[in-house]
Swiss-Prot record:
This is NADH dehydrogenase [ubiquinone] 1 subunit C2. Complex I is composed of 45 different subunits. Interacts with TMEM242. It is a single-pass membrane protein. GO terms for cellular component: mitochondrial inner membrane; respiratory chain complex I. It is found in: Mitochondrion inner membrane. Keywords: Electron transport, Membrane, Mitochondrion, Mitochondrion inner membrane, Respiratory chain, Transmembrane, Transmembrane helix, Transport. Accessory subunit of the mitochondrial membrane respiratory chain NADH dehydrogenase (Complex I), that is believed not to be involved in catalysis but required for the complex assembly. Complex I functions in the transfer of electrons from NADH to the respiratory chain. The immediate electron acceptor for the enzyme is believed to be ubiquinone. The gene is NDUFC2. It comes from Macaca fascicularis. Its main location: mitochondrion. Pfam families: NDUF_C2. The chain crosses the membrane at residues 56-75.
């Protein structure tokens, strides 16, 4: 098992993550997790042999809200880990520019062959 980089017990997001913008409330990942909450309510009704779509609408709303809330923080954590990874990668690229040299840019005229229409 790989140890964590900065092991801090009971810390979901460090204070450093507060500088990142929050995820949008209409983020497709959040809407997908909310839909999974709705599906969890349907499965719960199916398991307990209740009418699948019509029984316990308050339970459906509870599942949707809970899944959406958890998904929000999971998306926020994912964005933070990607930001840390990007910062480390760009820092490495600044320290080792010889490994990431710029290639000479070619125009499309140099890449493609001459076009001769055939009629």
């Amino acid at each position: 098992m790989v140890p964590r980089r900065n092991p801090e017990p009971l810390r979901f997001l460090p204070d450093e993550s507060r500088s990142l913008p929050p995820p949008k409330l209409t983020d497709p990942r959040l809407l997908y997790v909310g839909f999974l909450g709705y599906c969890a309510g349907l499965v719960d009704n199916f398991i307990h042999r209740r009418p699948i779509r019509s029984a316990g609408l308050h339970r459906h709303l509870l599942y949707i809200t809970a899944f959406y809330f958890v998904g929000y923080y999971l998306v926020k954590r994912g964005d933070y880990t990607y930001a840390v990874r990007d910062r480390e990668m760009f820092g490495y690229m600044k320290l080792h520019p010889e490994d990431f040299s710029e290639k000479e840019k070619k125009t499309y005229a140099e890449i493609f062959e001459k076009f001769h229409p055939i009629r």
